[in-house]
């Protein structure tokens, strides 16, 4: 029986497919491979499949390709150990070097142009401003997806609702969910999770609630009076014991770029709608008892609050588009309010985002859903405590978890969750099985971004170069599944690994020194562990 699944909801409701009236029939597309999400990973997946002669359609909710690469990041910024990066990602690193620039954050427009050229050169059909509406499955396979036309705002904020009835339907033999949110995966009925597992779930020492950083700042509406309630932005839930599970994942933010007064576009004045929520920031600034790291391009880890709205990210992954739009808008307002409260005179750097009023069009969604797939990558895989026989590429970054929320500890405000630990002796292999659902859940879907991993493991693998590597490997796997007429779980592994090597992917660490990266990480970590007042805001 064919079933349709309404996507974009917290739950998934199955119902029988019904014929639409002729007047509302969506445009129809057919391809060998459908990629949902034109992130950097999604483009790499599409290019890999197209290079093998397969037709590809990419559905992208925004007006741009590349996601965070071109939306605030460059390929090289989180690529501290490039020698073990190959394939298309290596090519992109070389392009990054050619693009040049004085800062690892600038020239964002050049990367958006680069991704568009890649799509054009390889004949990828891209449906911009189209997002998932519903999913059709039959016999354990995805059959088609129906897309809604929902143009985002000029600044990239998702539309609260689509402009009308279903706009497009894509049928494909293999689907790849390369979105940051994992909407196609969820819509297909594949199990997934959000938040942080407990330390006991996978026996991970870095998992769960941990690392409280306390500030000499009163959390109550009336200082010293718990009965007056907590200030906005402070999580009222109990902190929980160390290592316990939490629904909160790491903070999101925009990767902003500023220049001096008069050199760029002024940051717009904030609205009054959210002003009352910032009493905590006002108190920190007025009492000078907690570091407020603004302006900066990141989430300053010593700051009580900076680029991220504490805890607000935790509802994003499971929200519908109306709620996501509201959350995204709150982040835009957060930038304006923080700029106004701190009295910053810096301006938005011109030329980086000329078609979104110099404001980044992509919210940095560090983690959202995580698939519960055929294999779950964990801290033990990063530490080489397991054996991976189906590697699709190498991860290399440390476990990097930004503060997750604000809590109360002993009557003071504290951040919770920040973790930065290098547990890997060297670049570690990522299992192909972590890109595939369990066979009984879906047989023609690959997931290179919201892959099957614990919160700890994905906190290392979440870097854009790694996502790009996984995207290319997913594209090659899709080709193998089509050519072998097999489920993605059943492709011939030796032939697949040979295809990855032929594409230039690096599958094994050669054991040579990781010391340069380790020394750099230790230097960075030492700086992060200094008292907040002695650390300059990140730029």
Predicted regions and their residues:
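Positively charged n-region of N-terminal signal peptides that target proteins for export
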Residues: 1-7
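Beta1/beta-strand and adjacent pyrophosphate-binding region of the FAD-binding site
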Residues: 28-39
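Flavin (FAD/FMN)-binding glycine-rich loop and adjacent Rossmann-like elements that form
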Residues: 151-174, 178-537
């Amino acid at each position: 029986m064919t079933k349709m699944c309404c996507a974009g909801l917290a739950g998934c409701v199955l119902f029988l497919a019904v014929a639409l009236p002729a007047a509302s029939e969506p445009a129809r597309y057919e391809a060998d491979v459908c990629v949902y999400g034109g992130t950097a990973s999604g483009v790499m997946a599409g290019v890999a499949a197209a290079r093998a002669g397969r037709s590809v359609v990419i559905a992208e909710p925004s007006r741009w390709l590349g996601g965070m690469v071109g939306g605030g990041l460059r390929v090289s910024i989180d690529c501290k150990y490039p020698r073990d990066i190959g394939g298309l990602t290596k090519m992109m690193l070389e392009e990054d070097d050619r693009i040049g620039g004085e800062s690892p954050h600038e020239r964002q427009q050049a990367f958006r142009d680069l991704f568009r050229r890649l799509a054009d050169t390889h004949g990828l059909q891209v449906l911009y401003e189209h997002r998932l509406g519903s999913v059709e499955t039959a016999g354990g396979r995805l059959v088609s997806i129906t897309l809604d036309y929902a143009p985002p705002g000029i600044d990239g904020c998702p539309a609260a609702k689509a402009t009308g009835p279903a706009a497009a339907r894509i049928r494909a033999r293999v689907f790849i969910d390369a979105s940051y949110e994992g909407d196609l995966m969820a819509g297909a009925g594949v199990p997934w999770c959000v938040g942080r597992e407990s330390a006991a779930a996978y026996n991970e020492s870095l998992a769960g609630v941990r690392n409280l950083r306390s500030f000499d700042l009163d959390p109550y509406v009336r200082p010293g009076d718990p009965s007056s309630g907590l200030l906005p932005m402070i999580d009222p839930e109990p902190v929980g014991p160390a290592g316990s599970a939490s629904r909160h994942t790491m903070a999101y933010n925009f990767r902003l770029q500023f220049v001096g007064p008069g050199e760029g576009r002024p940051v717009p004045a904030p609205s009054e709608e959210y002003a009352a929520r910032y009493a905590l920031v006002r108190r920190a600034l007025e009492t000078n008892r907690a570091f407020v790291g603004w302006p900066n391009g990141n989430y300053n880890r010593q700051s009580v609050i900076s680029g991220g709205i504490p805890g607000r990210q935790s509802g994003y992954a499971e929200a519908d588009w109306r709620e996501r739009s509201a959350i995204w808008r709150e982040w835009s307002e957060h930038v304006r309010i923080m700029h106004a409260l701190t009295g910053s005179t810096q301006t938005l750097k011109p030329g980086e985002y000329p078609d979104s009023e110099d404001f980044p069009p992509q919210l940095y969604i560090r983690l959202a859903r995580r698939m519960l797939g055929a294999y779950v990558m964990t801290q033990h895989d990063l530490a080489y405590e397991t054996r991976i026989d189906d590697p699709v590429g190498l991860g290399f970054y440390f476990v990097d978890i930004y503060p997750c929320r604000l809590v109360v500890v002993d009557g003071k405000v504290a951040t919770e969750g920040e973790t930065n630990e290098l547990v890997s002796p060297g670049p570690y292999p990522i299992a192909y099985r972590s890109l595939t659902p369990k066979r009984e859940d879906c047989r023609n879907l690959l997931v290179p971004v919201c892959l099957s991993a614990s919160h700890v493991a994905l906190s290392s693998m979440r870097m854009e170069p790694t996502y790009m590597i996984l995207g290319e490997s997913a594209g090659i796997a899709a080709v193998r599944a089509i050519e072998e007429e097999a489920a993605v779980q059943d492709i011939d592994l030796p032939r697949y690994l040979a295809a990855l090597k032929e594409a230039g992917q690096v599958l094994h660490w050669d054991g040579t020194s990781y010391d340069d990266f380790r020394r750099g990480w230790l230097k960075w970590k030492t700086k992060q562990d200094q008292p907040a007042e002695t650390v300059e805001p990140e730029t």
